[in-house]
């Protein structure tokens, strides 16, 4: 009988999963839930190909981790089999705490608890079921293990999470800028004093990686239409929650119903087992099914927003470098309340103003160390000939104004 399972992945080809702990994790219901959650949430409103799931991403990141362990070992870095298995388990589980449309859900229904916190709660829960087999994986995930480079491979500037999602998201969206040479970067990785370093001949690959990441952020992750659909979903769920807490009857799956009809804060999420229990029952289907049914609800705010989500009648977006004036805000709200025959308070659900800040490289977070033949190291910001690092470290702030289109405004 074979000692491994082989999965064919469109991005990396054949991925080998050894039987035992790692295969048990892949088959676990908590990881299988990620097959029902899209990696890029609402980005398919812009890039119709972006239908891939968080499960596919977890497998891809696992594959890259396996390759990295092989390369680091071949360079004479001693990694115990137990450490290799633990770091592979940690990367398989790194996204287990994502809900459907993750950031939307965190901010509207999950009481502001981040997916990283939920991932850890779920790992600890799985660890109990698996009789402590994930102890080392959790230590690495929490950065409590002496070999720091293992944590850096799970969560750092050059982690396997990023190396996979840039390649994968580029592949499925068709945005070629993200198509980084992950294999080349992995070959350049090494370890010095228990920290991850990159061989000096890999500088150009790293510069390319940082630039690709920046381009993918503005073209995919922060694309104005994706931002608009996200804001629209936030407002739809916020309205649904407001109606639910007023006692209005709404269609919802049992898990979604739990979050709509109970006001939940961070403290309760941590202390009530019901929160986690219901959270792991949620996936994209709960949200889409609710939106379909809410499209015909008697509440004009909820039904208009839900229909907009279902039929891709999304908010109009303006991206500016300065904030909106009070007068402009009032003008938009007046038009919307006339258009839908609703009051100003209700009209606010059809306007969203936010700013987004993004810089690709923060030295203080996790610098990328370049190692030279003589053993000395320098940060990429100093080692790079290109001036792009100073550009990448600069904060870029954009203001997004999203609002309901007027009736005579096309797409």
Question: Where are the predicted features?
Answer:
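Histidine-centered, transition-metal-coordinating active-site segments
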Residues: 1-86, 100-106, 110-411
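Short active-site segment of divalent metal-dependent hydrolases/proteases
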Residues: 93, 97-98
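Short alpha-helical catalytic segment bearing the HExxH-like zincin motif
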Residues: 87-92
């Amino acid at each position: 009988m074979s000692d491994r399972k082989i999965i064919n992945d469109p991005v990396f080809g054949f991925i080998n999963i050894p039987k035992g702990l790692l295969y048990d994790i892949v088959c676990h219901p908590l990881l299988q839930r990620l097959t029902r959650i899209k990696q890029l949430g609402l980005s398919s409103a812009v890039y119709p190909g972006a239908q891939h799931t968080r499960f596919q991403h977890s497998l891809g990141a696992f594959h890259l981790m396996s390759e990295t362990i092989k390369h680091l070992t071949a360079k004479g870095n001693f990694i115990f089999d137990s450490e290799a298995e633990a770091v592979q388990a940690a990367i398989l589980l790194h996204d287990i705490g994502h809900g459907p449309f993750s950031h939307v859900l965190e901010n509207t229904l999950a009481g502001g608890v981040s997916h990283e916190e939920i991932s850890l709660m779920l790992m600890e829960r799985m660890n109990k079921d698996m009789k402590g087999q994930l102890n080392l994986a959790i230590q690495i995930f929490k950065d409590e293990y002496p070999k720091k480079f293992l944590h850096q491979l799970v969560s750092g500037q050059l982690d396997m999470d990023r190396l996979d999602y840039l390649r994968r998201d580029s592949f499925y969206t068709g945005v070629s800028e993200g198509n980084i040479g992950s294999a080349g970067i992995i070959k350049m990785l090494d370890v010095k004093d228990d920290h991850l370093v990159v061989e000096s001949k890999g500088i150009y690959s790293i510069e390319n990686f940082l630039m690709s990441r920046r381009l993918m952020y503005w073209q995919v992750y922060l694309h104005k239409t994706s931002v608009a659909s996200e804001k629209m979903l936030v407002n739809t769920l916020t309205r649904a929650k407001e109606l639910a807490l007023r006692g209005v009857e709404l269609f919802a799956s049992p898990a979604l119903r739990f979050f709509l009809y109970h006001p939940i804060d961070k403290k309760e999420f941590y202390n009530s087992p019901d929160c986690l229990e219901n959270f792991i029952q949620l996936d994209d289907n709960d949200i889409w099914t609710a939106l379909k049914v809410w499209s015909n609800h008697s509440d004009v705010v909820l039904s208009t927003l839900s229909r907009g989500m279902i039929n891709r009648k999304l908010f109009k977006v303006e991206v500016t470098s300065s904030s909106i004036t009070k007068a402009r805000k009032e003008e938009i709200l007046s038009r919307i309340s006339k258009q839908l025959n609703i009051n100003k308070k209700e009209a606010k659900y059809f306007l969203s103003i936010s700013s987004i800040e993004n810089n690709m490289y923060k030295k203080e977070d996790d610098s990328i160390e370049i190692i030279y033949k003589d053993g000395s190291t320098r940060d990429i910001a100093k080692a790079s000939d290109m001036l792009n690092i100073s550009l990448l470290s600069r904060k870029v702030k954009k203001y997004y104004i999203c609002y309901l289109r007027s009736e005579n405004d096309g797409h």
